[in-house]
Amino acid sequence: MWLGLAVFWTFATRHTKPARWRESIGSRTLHVLPLLAGAVLLAAPHWLPSVLSTRIVPGGRSFSVLGAVMVAGGLGFAAWARARLGRNWSGIVTVKEDHALVRTGPYRAVRHPIYTGLLLALIGTAMTIGEWRGVVAVIFVLIGFLWKIHVEEERMCENFPEYAQYRQQTAALIPLLY
C-alpha cells in the first residue's frame, strides 16, 4: 500500500506550480530528519537494539487486520488531500505563484489532512508490526510533522488573510482535538 502511494505521489508532482518562496534547508532538515529516523525504525529492525524489537501488541489476526485497515484508510485520505491540492502541492514548504487556499474536501475537517492520513497509516503500520520501534517511529514522525505544520502555518498566515479564520474554525491535524 505504501508503494502505491509513492507511485501516485511521484506522478502527481509533475505538474505543480512554480514556487515564489521556498523553505530554508535548515528548516527543512528539522522536519526531514525525524521522518527519516521513523522510516529507519520501521524498515531496519535488525539494526536496532533488541528492546525496540520487543513485541507490545498481542499477536493475532485482529490487530493485523485493524492495522491494515488503518493503513488503507490513512493512505486513501492522504491521497485524496493531495489530489485536492492539485498544482498547489509541494513536498517542501513553498509559496506558489497564484497559490490558492484550499478549504474543500478533507481540508474541511483538518488543515493538514495529508499529515493526518499519513499519521493514521503509520499508526496502522506500527500496530501491524506490533513492536516498540513502531511507537518510537510514530513519535519521530509526529515531531517532524509538527515542525512542518508550524512552518506551513506561518507562511499561510502571511499569504492568506482569511487563513486566521480558517485556523480558528478547523483543527490542524486531528478533527475536534488539535
Language model feature labels by segment:
Residues 99-107, 116:
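Alpha-helical membrane-protein architecture signal
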Residues 112:
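Short, conserved phosphate/pyrophosphate- and ester-handling motifs at nucleotide-, phospho-/glycolipid
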Residues 1-96, 103, 121-178:
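Membrane-anchoring alpha-helices and their flanking helix-loop junctions
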